[in-house]
């Protein structure tokens, strides 16, 4: 789940040329999200893909042997990650995933599954005013989840270190 790269991820030359930041080094400037003008079309975001969302296809992916998933969101808010994880957990449990909250937290006018399903007509999108308003509405509720004190769990740790043998570390919760 998360952002799709118009280029081959990490290989974007546009980021380096326009943004002076190498996507090859994890510093993508997201130049593809900018509006461009070409052939009479002005300020068109022709390279801006919607974020990928395969949550509705989770059971099918599991049947195909997919054992782990990645949420693309290293620069996203904790609320976004929480909404994505919640939707994935719900789908995995056979429940109806809360895609409305996930979409409200952040989307570019919805999501796409076009590369997976082959339905590529609605793959492009940008953040619209409605997307921003939805986020402002849902974020305070989700932020409350992070205002609770972090629970502390007592751990017992055993370390065994002997010359010529691999070190062994064992942790147990109380």
Residue ranges and their predicted role:
Residues 1-174:
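Surface-exposed amphipathic alpha-helical tracts and adjacent flexible/coil segments at the periphery
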